[in-house]
Curated annotation (Swiss-Prot):
Belongs to the bacterial ribosomal protein bL19 family. PANTHER family: LARGE RIBOSOMAL SUBUNIT PROTEIN BL19M, RIBOSOMAL PROTEIN L19. This protein is located at the 30S-50S ribosomal subunit interface and may play a role in the structure and function of the aminoacyl-tRNA binding site. GO terms for molecular function: structural constituent of ribosome. It comes from Psychromonas ingrahamii (strain DSM 17664 / CCUG 51855 / 37). GO terms for biological process: translation. Keywords: Ribonucleoprotein, Ribosomal protein. The lineage of its organism: Bacteria, Pseudomonadati, Pseudomonadota, Gammaproteobacteria, Alteromonadales. One of its GO terms (cellular component) is cytosolic large ribosomal subunit. This is Large ribosomal subunit protein bL19. The keyword Heme does not apply.
Length: 119
């Protein structure tokens, strides 16, 4: 029975998701339906948490709005609402959950960038 469920879940999983981790800055394009029209809306922020549970995987993205308020949004990784995910920059962090960023503001909330290897 569980083999059948696993096979169906594997069939519904997305294969076009890039590899990203907490601390990375990502641009998530979300499908928004307004009346009859459908468009993609960009949500850019830092990944503060990632939950890997197969088809039920999710990740939390936090961005600072124009008035200084933090906005967090949880996205289901394999949801059809998520149009695409683009990694803008990779961050260096030593924790899996970056909930401490909620209390930090300004320059204290910055994350170091992971630079590429020199050849």
């Amino acid at each position: 029975m569980s083999n059948i469920i696993q096979a169906i879940e594997k069939e519904q999983m997305r294969s076009d998701m890039p590899k990203f981790a907490p601390g990375d800055t990502v641009i998530v394009r979300v499908r928004v339906k307004e009346g009859e029209k459908e468009r993609l809306q960009a949500f850019e922020g830092v990944v503060i948490a990632k939950r890997n549970r197969g088809l039920h995987s999710a990740f939390t993205v936090r961005k600072m709005s124009s008035n200084g308020e933090g906005v967090e949004r949880v996205f289901q990784t394999h949801s059809p609402i998520v149009g695409s995910v683009e990694v803008k920059r990779r961050g260096v962090v030593r924790q899996a959950k970056l909930y401490y960023l909620r209390e930090l503001t300004g320059k204290k909330a910055r994350i170091k960038e992971k630079l590429g290897k020199k050849k």
